[in-house]
């Protein structure tokens, strides 16, 4: 297993290098540039000022030279400074947004897993029942409902029409004047709509995966043997079928790791949540190349790490993978 992990890690390095190079080239060749955002309404900006900014940002060099200079800094975890007038380090801007995105997505993932597993198990063990039909309908609705449409619908209903919940940000304008418990309630109320929207589609997908996985497991011979021995259905499902049915779900959870850091671009933009997703959108529209590349590197690295973690985890929970790899190695 250690040799397998090392081999996959070594293969991931050139892949990460290729991802960063292609991303850098695509971003550099995109229409417009940072100067279009820095001096859009200044017709008196002299040619000398623009040339100075171009030289300062290194935009006058060929793309491969710019990429090499960026790569040398990135290896030292120095992603440069933002092209915006504040000129703040990229890691500083990302560090300010990362805890918010991580907190929201961890809550979302915990809710999805906590609800999807029992929903999927019950749907599989009661196949074609009324419960199974209702959950199947919910899954189809969840897959077909766009996040942005659901977000706007809930904002209009609960925020505008009923006035029950706030629709943007993480705290109200008068937050500093509230008592401690009022501040906690205010923060919680701001989380309700984003978390509901984020978990709706994910819950539909995970519960469907769990149902399909459980259906495949309960048809296996060892499950039928456990039933033939007279074990109760509860024991058969909980002790014999559930563990093996969770294998695909473990893989999916590992692959969801990049999303915990990358954030949801749509949800954070609609609800004005200052997270990684909103930072990515703002950086793209302002052509802030260093921040865009910093986000892409983090997401790409986590994607490769997630694939490695998924493979290792699958081998740990499924002995057939470990012993099969040993036999092939011999």
Question: What does each model-found stretch correspond to?
Answer:
Residues 6, 10-14, 63, 106, ...:
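Membrane-interface helix starts
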């Amino acid at each position: 297993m250690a040799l397998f992990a090392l081999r996959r890690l070594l293969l991931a390095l050139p892949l990460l290098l290729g991802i960063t190079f292609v991303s850098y080239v695509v971003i550099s060749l995109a229409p417009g540039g940072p100067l279009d955002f820095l001096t859009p309404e200044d017709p008196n900006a002299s040619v000398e000022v623009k040339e100075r900014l171009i030289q300062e940002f290194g935009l006058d060099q060929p793309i491969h030279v710019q990429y090499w200079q960026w790569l040398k800094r990135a290896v030292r975890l120095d992603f440069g400074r933002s092209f915006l007038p504040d000129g703040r380090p990229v890691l500083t801007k990302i560090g300010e947004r990362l805890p918010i995105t991580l907190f929201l997505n961890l809550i979302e993932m915990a809710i999805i897993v906590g609800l999807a597993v029992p929903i999927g198990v019950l749907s599989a063990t009661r196949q074609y029942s009324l419960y199974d039909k209702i959950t199947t309908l919910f899954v189809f609705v969840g897959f077909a409902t766009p996040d942005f449409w659901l977000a706007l619908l809930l904002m209009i209903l609960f925020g505008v029409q009923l006035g029950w919940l706030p629709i943007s940000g993480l705290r109200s304008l008068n937050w500093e004047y509230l008592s401690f418990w009022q501040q906690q309630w205010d923060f919680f109320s701001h989380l309700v709509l984003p978390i509901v929207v984020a978990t709706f589609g994910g819950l539909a997908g995970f519960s469907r995966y769990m149902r399909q996985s459980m259906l495949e497991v309960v048809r296996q011979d060892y499950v039928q043997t456990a039933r033939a021995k007279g074990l109760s259905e509860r024991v058969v499902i909980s002790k014999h079928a559930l563990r093996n049915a969770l294998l695909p779900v473990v893989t999916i959870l590992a692959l969801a790791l990049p999303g915990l850091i990358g954030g949801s671009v749509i949800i954070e933009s609609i609800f004005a949540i200052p997270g990684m997703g909103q930072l990515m959108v703002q950086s793209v529209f302002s052509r802030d190349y260093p921040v865009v590349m910093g986000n892409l590197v983090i997401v790409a690295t986590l994607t490769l790490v997630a694939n490695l973690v998924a493979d290792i985890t699958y081998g740990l929970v499924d002995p057939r993978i470990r012993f099969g790899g040993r036999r092939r190695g011999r």
